[in-house]
């Protein structure tokens, strides 16, 4: 399956290469990119269980395949939908509990697609997979609440504009109301549609300056 997805026969060597790294004291934080009907479900479960047996593998991030609007002459892939996201969350959370926690997590994007509340910050341990989008929302909420409490009440009387991707916009709008009330601000949140990579790309980290300028003018 790995060879099919990556179109590279050398990927068959990956398990042995990882075991060699682990045997030499290298610690690995790994990522599984999941394609519906290709490597989800039982295949995903087997992949996580397999990684759990590899010496040196510390954590696993499970992230949905990302597809831009530029897929000419590429294989047709199925995007993650709400039901698939819910099934994947259930699978991964169950395995994480089985392994004692702090081994495998779904990225925040899964929770957004599933319309499921993201776990609290304590669920993510040391946030080892935050760069893969695991626990970003929980960490942001924790930092926001702490900073807002430290700031105290103010009446700044200013207007500020915030920009983000489509996925995070509802969350940012919710917390911007707290910010406005606490600091005496007028806050407007702008959800930027990603025309550069394609409208299916909704994460904030891939919003481009060009799209921001075009949509805010």
Model-predicted regions and their roles:
Residues 1, 101-111, 116-124:
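Active-site-facing alpha/beta catalytic cores
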Residues 5, 36, 165:
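Short, glycine-rich nucleotide/cofactor-binding loops
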Residues 10-11, 41, 85, 205, ...:
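A conditional alpha-helix N-cap/helix-loop micro-motif detector
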Residues 1, 37-39, 68-71, 112-114, ...:
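Flexible loop/turn segments at secondary-structure boundaries
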Residues 1-11:
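Hydrophobic, small-residue-rich alpha-helical packing segments that form membrane-like cores
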Residues 115-217:
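Radical SAM enzyme core and accessory elements
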Residues 7, 76-81:
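Glycine-rich tight-turn/loop motif centered on a GG-T
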Residues 15-74, 83-109:
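Conserved C-terminal portion of the radical SAM core fold
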């Amino acid at each position: 399956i790995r060879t099919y997805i990556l179109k590279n026969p050398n990927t068959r060597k990956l398990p042995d290469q990882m075991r060699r790294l682990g045997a030499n004291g290298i610690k690995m934080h790994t990522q599984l990119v999941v394609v519906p009907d290709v490597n989800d479900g039982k295949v995903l479960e087997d992949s996580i269980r397999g990684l759990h047996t590899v010496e040196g593998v510390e954590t696993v991030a499970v992230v949905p395949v990302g597809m831009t609007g530029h897929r000419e002459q590429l294989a047709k892939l199925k995007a993650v939908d709400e039901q698939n996201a819910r099934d994947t969350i259930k699978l991964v959370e169950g395995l994480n509990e089985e392994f004692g926690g702090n081994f495998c997590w779904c990225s925040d994007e899964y929770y957004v697609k599933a319309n499921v509340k993201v776990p609290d910050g304590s669920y993510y341990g040391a946030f080892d997979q935050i760069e893969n989008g695991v626990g970003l929302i929980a960490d942001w909420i924790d930092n926001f609440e702490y900073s807002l409490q430290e700031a105290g009440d103010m009446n700044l009387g200013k207007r500020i504009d915030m920009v983000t991707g489509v996925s995070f916009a509802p969350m940012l709008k919710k917390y911007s109301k707290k910010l406005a009330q606490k600091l005496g601000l007028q806050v407007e949140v702008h959800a930027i549609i990603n025309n550069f990579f394609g409208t299916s790309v909704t994460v904030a980290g891939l919003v481009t300056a060009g799209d921001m300028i075009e949509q805010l003018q």
